[in-house]
Structures are given as structure tokens and as C-alpha cells.
Amino acid sequence: MNLSIQDELQLFSEELYRHLTPSLLEELAKELGFVKRKRKFSGNELATICIWVSQRTASDSLVRLCSQLHAATGPLMSPEGLNKRFDKKAVEFLKYIFSALWKSKLCKTSAISSAALTYFQRIRILDATIFQVPKHLAHVYPGSGGCAQTAGIKIQLEYDLHSGQFLNFQVGPGKNNDKTFGTDCLDTLRPGDLCIRDLGYFSLEDLDQMDQRGVCYISRLKLNHTVYTKNPFPEYFRNGTIKKQSQYIQVDLENIMHTLKPGQTYEIKESYIGKNQRLFTRVIIYRLTEEQILERRKKQSYTESKKGITFSEKSKRLTGINIYVTNTPWEVVPMEQIHDFYSLRWQIEIIFKTWKSLFQIHHWQTIKQERLECHVYGKLIAIFICSSTMFKMRQLLLQKHKRELSEYKAIGMIQDHLSLLYQAIQRNTRIITKVLIRLFTLLKKNGRKSHRYEKKTIFDIMGVVYEYNGLRKQKKAA
């Protein structure tokens, strides 16, 4: 059924309202013990100050926060009184709202149509972002180490590129292990998924589990793993049987690197990785361009100086290549398209960039733990509202006008309308829909993705049919 834009946004408004209506927040605050009797600062006021009104709950002064709350809702509070209300129950309240939102149906109808969707029901992107917190919280949020990382919060996110649906989420200490979280995410896999993983989540066991569950993967290969390929000249016993230890030989990756031109791709046929535990898989080598090599060397120098991590000589020698492993069928994703498909994971970097540059989730002053956590979960709720709205707008703009939306531009514009959304949610879904229609009109006019650098966009790689500058574009996946 092809619904109108208004009907689509009305359904979205109803789902949003269902989780954030003032009466529901008041009831939830009582259930969770944040409010035990009628007070001037209740669940709706906490949500107002942490989600909607203040952009700097952790960095503005308490006097300023009291002023913002008074302007928005009327209650007059003292700085000391407000600070007391940032307690464990307040954190639990905001955490519950965020959990209910990201597990809701807000993004269930936001999936875009693409050639990639024919083969992969979900394209799962997993990554983490980390930021420092006050040093006195190091016992609660120990950092990841390195220079000035005594205390930090790490946020792990896995989401579906087609719909924007959050699949797995974790807020924890900066020292939390990426690989452990990646393994935990296996429980939510479904046949037909494609998982794109970077080096921090690399695990032979996890890749093997994906393969057994009918899930495809594309992953960078850690250089401490050896690649073996079928020996064209194996040794034989006198009876004509092949000597098992000569059936496969180790691949000289450095030698292959020197034979490739910048931007060239090479696939090692009939290969496996691992010594003790073998994983038979496709192995693809991509030769970086000179520009990409310079960028990588800069990152390596930064990592060595800031985080105290030393790269091995082998890693430095193989700086010029990316090695990918994948179990995707070659007829679905040929070797020439593997690097482009892997680059889809950089979309999550755009999401994380908005968290810091637009929402300033990493900004704080020296405050108590509960106020910092209220800030983090309040920001995450606002971020999810904006990102889920963006993914819905992206789907509608493609469906109705065949245009590609810029995720970064759109989230910024939606953030500018948070105060209007807040006022609408205090009333009804009809008013919310009006605000969303205004937003859609704005995004249609000013939110289109730029193609200035002639780089492939996410739509190009995924094989989405769309129009740009009046021309209809239909690119195969890559």
C-alpha cells in the first residue's frame, strides 16, 4: 500500500508520541520510583531538561539549568534542589525511556529499497565511540589507557544500514573490550544478514559462527593471522596420495602487495586463514592509493603517540594494503566490489560525528556521576529521536522524489526543530505530524547529499535507484 507522506508521518508521529507523552512519563516515573509523591519536578520535567530544552546538562551551571526549566515548564527550583534530583532513580528513568525507544518500531518502516536488499535483508554495521569523563569517576568508568585516558565512557552501537534500526547497544567503561561485545551481538543474527566488521571486532570464532548461521560477513583481517592457499605443486606419497602438510602453502602478502597497482584488487583463490583453527573463506587484497597510504600513516603515528600502541614491523610494511575476508558469494559481491561494500561501515562514523559535533555528548564539567549519566542518556534519547526521524525522511525522500538525503545535514536540521517537536508532543499527534511535514519540506529543499567529489555514495554502493541533478541514476551494488 502506497501511503501519502502525511499518512506515513502520522504513523511515525503516533509511535513517537506513544513513548514520550507527558502522562506516560509521569506514570513511568512513579513506577520506577523517581517520583513517590506529587512534586513540582516530576518525570516530564526531568525529560524536558535532559532531552529537549538544555543542550548542555553536564556543562551548563545549575543556575542556568534552573532558568531553562522555569522558562519551559514553570517550576521554580533552587540549584541545590535540582542537583539532588539528578539521582540514581533519575538515571534509571532516562535509561528506561532510551531502551524502550531504540527497541521500538520507529525505524521498522524506514527501510530503503536497494539492489543489496535482494541478497541481504539487513546490512549490520558495528562500531564504538569513546569520550573522556571526569577523573574522579575512573573507578566507575575506567578509561582505555594511553595519554589522559584515565576515565572514559565507551558506547557500542550496531545498526541496520537499510532502515536505521538499532540492533545492539551498550554504554560502559572506556576499557570495555570490543571483541566481547561483537560476540554478544551474535545472538541477534538472522539468516540473510550481512555483517561488516573492522579489526577491533575480528574473531575467527565469530566469523565461523556467522557462516554456520547462514549470515554473510565482510571483515578486515588482522595481520597476525596467516593466509594459506592451495599448493599448485603438492608432494605425493608413492601410492599417489597427496601429503597433507603440502596441500596448502603460506601466502606471501608482501610480495602480492608489490605486484598490485594503487586501487587494484586481487583475490587469493581456494584459501583459508588461521593456523590452529582454520576458516575457509574468500581472501581479497586491495592496494591503497597514495592518498590513502598517507592518511593511514598519519593515523598510525597519532595512535602510537597518543595511545602508546606500537605497530609491528609487519604492520608497517603492509601499510599499503587492506586484506578482507568474506563468505559472500562471488557472483553477488565480486572482488572488485568488496572494498566499496566494506566502506559502508564508515556510515557509522557519520552518526558518531553528529553525536559529538552537533549534540556535544562529550562535553562536561566536573560533576557527580548521576548528573553525568542523566546527561548521557538524555542526549542519547535526543540523538535517537533525530536519527530515527532522519532515516524516515531518507526513506520518504527516496520513495516519493527519488532523492538521496545527506544524513549529516538532515540530523542537524532535525536537531534545530527539537523545540518544536517538544511543544507538539505536549499536545497531540496531529501537531507532531505538522512539524514533521514542515521538516520534510525543508529537507527536500536543502538536505540533498552533495556529489562534489565524485565519490560513490551509500546509495551508489547499495544499488539504489535515485535521481541527481535531474538525471536518473541506477548503479549496481558497487
Swiss-Prot record:
InterPro entries: RNaseH-like_sf (IPR012337), Transpos_IS4 (IPR047952), Transposase_11 (IPR002559). Involved in the transposition of the insertion sequence. NCBIfam families: transpos_IS4_1 (NF033592). One of its GO terms (molecular function) is DNA binding. Belongs to the transposase 11 family. This is Transposase for insertion sequence element IS231C. The lineage of its organism: Bacteria, Bacillati, Bacillota, Bacilli, Bacillales. One of its GO terms (biological process) is DNA transposition. It comes from Bacillus thuringiensis subsp. berliner. The keyword DNA-binding applies. Keywords: DNA recombination, DNA-binding, Transposable element, Transposition. Coiled coil: none annotated.
